[in-house]
Regions:
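Short, Asp-centered acidic motifs that coordinate Mg2+ and/or phosphate
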Residues: 2, 99, 130
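Glycine-rich nucleotide phosphate-binding loop and flanking beta-alpha elements
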Residues: 10-12, 53, 76, 126, ...
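Glycine-rich dinucleotide-binding loop and its adjacent helix/turn
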Residues: 5-63
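Conserved SAM/SAH-binding loop
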Residues: 28, 103-107, 121-123
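FAD-site-proximal beta/loop scaffold in flavoenzymes
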Residues: 20-41, 125-166
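Rossmann-like dinucleotide-binding cores of NAD(P)H-dependent redox enzymes
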Residues: 43, 51-108
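Conserved beta-strand-loop-beta-strand element in the redox core of flavoprotein oxidoreductases
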Residues: 1-3, 110-125
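Short, acidic, Ser/Thr-enriched surface-loop or helix-capping motifs
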Residues: 95, 120, 158
Length: 166
């Protein structure tokens, strides 16, 4: 017998994920909420330069938004691709007007009137109208915790792709 365990995933959250104007992008409802924020001449801060963050930034630039991308690594797509390929993505975002803040993280996001103030780990801060969290996903494995299956950021598998621990 064969059983496929497709756990799914949810957007990784931060302490400020519930601040109005801060968005995640994982579901159609998330996309619909974010779409209302995509307005020309407004400023979007994108936290994370992986696939979700890079695509959201590109879309925001297309509609005429000012975009700042914040990424703790030295280049976008750093967890999925090498620095050279990430550099190509960075160049394209720069060509289209994005401000890139690499090698720095966000310490805090707080409302300031109708805008959001982002405090960064390098001591700088700036304001944006909306924020997108593109900082990865969390695998939905909680329901497997008492199953005996070995978990480590997902289901641990052996060389034959069989779950370890059962």
């Amino acid at each position: 017998d064969i059983l496929v365990i497709a756990t799914g995933a949810r957007a990784r959250r931060t302490p400020w994920a519930t601040v109005p104007g801060v968005h995640v992008l994982r579901t159609r409802d998330d996309a619909d909420r974010l779409r209302t924020e995509l307005v020309a001449d407004r400023h979007m801060a994108v936290i994370g330069a992986g696939f979700i963050g890079a695509e959201a930034a590109a879309t925001a630039l297309t509609v005429g938004m000012h975009v700042t991308i914040i990424e703790p690594l030295d280049a976008p797509m750093g967890r999925a691709m090498n620095t050279e390929v990430g550099g190509i993505f960075a160049d394209k975002h720069r060509e289209h007007g994005a401000e890139l803040r690499f090698g720095v993280s966000v310490e805090d996001v707080a409302p300031t009137g109708s805008r959001l103030r982002l405090a960064l780990t390098d001591g700088s801060a700036f304001e944006a109208d909306t924020v997108l969290l593109g900082i990865g996903a969390v695998v939905n494995t909680e329901w497997l915790e008492s199953s005996g299956i070995t978990l480590d950021n997902g289901v641990v598998c052996d060389a034959r792709l069989a779950a370890v621990g059962v």
